[in-house]
Amino acid sequence: MIELIKEMFSYHFMVRAVVVGALVSLCAALLGVSLVLKRYSMIGDGLSHVGFGALAIAAAANIAPLYLAVPVVIAAAFLLLRINQNSKIKGDAAIALISSSALAIGVVTVSLTTGMNTDVSNNMFGSILSLSRADAVLSIVLSAVVLLMFVLLYPRIFAVTFDETFARATGTKAQLINSVIAVLTAVTVVIGMRMMGALLISSLIIFPALTAMRVCRSFKGVVICSAVISVVCFVIGMAASYAFELPSGAAIVIVNIIAFAAFSFAALLKKRA
């Protein structure tokens, strides 16, 4: 395993892929804890479909993908919050409404213009190895911003996650914090789509948090454990992808599934002991 990892890091494109992927995995895991506890974990899936629609339009218009997708997905995140808070359409229904609409727009755009070319396929199924240097630099900068914002707002995110009503009563601007979480999630989804694809990006948000919750009981413990699990599973998944010539996104998800099963079994044994 060590020799395999050394061989991986001997290639510049693999180093770039691992650095970007590890940062995206870390961001997704940290945000995932709050989203899972707030029963909003499928927002990643919904926003990824919006991202696919935006990337399809960018490809058709010959626009740099991230420059169009980031603002569009952020706008979709705000729209999701507004629909969820101010209408009778709640939670998963709001996500399904926006995601299916955006996915349909993306599919129609692809059909009428470029067709299912390599870029569209990469955005749908993921291909972290196709990251350009410019995409990698932008992804690293955006990931650093997400991590910094999460650390700075950690106490408020904790308060809003567990008891939004009490958080409002103590002076926390809950709506603003929810908006920040939505924006950070949107940015993470967009930069993560290149690695995982629109079909699998939500797994980076859901699996590490659920796995950590099998063995940890405090919010801080779950956050730290989730972050470690996410990065470790990513590295192992990339190594498996490299060794067995598997799609990187699918390999990473399978490793996360194995980790979830192992932690669930460990929690069961601990409960019976």
Task: Pin down the residues of each PLM region.
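Transmembrane helix-bundle core of multi-pass membrane transporters
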Residues: 4-7, 11-16, 95-155
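Alpha-helical transmembrane segments of multipass membrane proteins
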Residues: 30-34, 56-57, 78-82, 107-108, ...
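Transmembrane alpha-helical segments in multi-pass inner-membrane proteins
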Residues: 201-250
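Membrane-interface capping segments at transmembrane-helix boundaries
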Residues: 155-156, 265-273
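Loop-to-transmembrane alpha-helix initiation sites
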Residues: 17, 66-73, 92-96, 140, ...
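C-terminal binding/interaction regions
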Residues: 2-10, 124, 128-129, 229-266
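Helix-loop-helix "hairpin" substructures at the membrane interface of multi-pass membrane proteins
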Residues: 135-208
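Short loop segments and helix-boundary regions at transmembrane helix junctions
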Residues: 33-116, 212-224, 241-244, 268-270
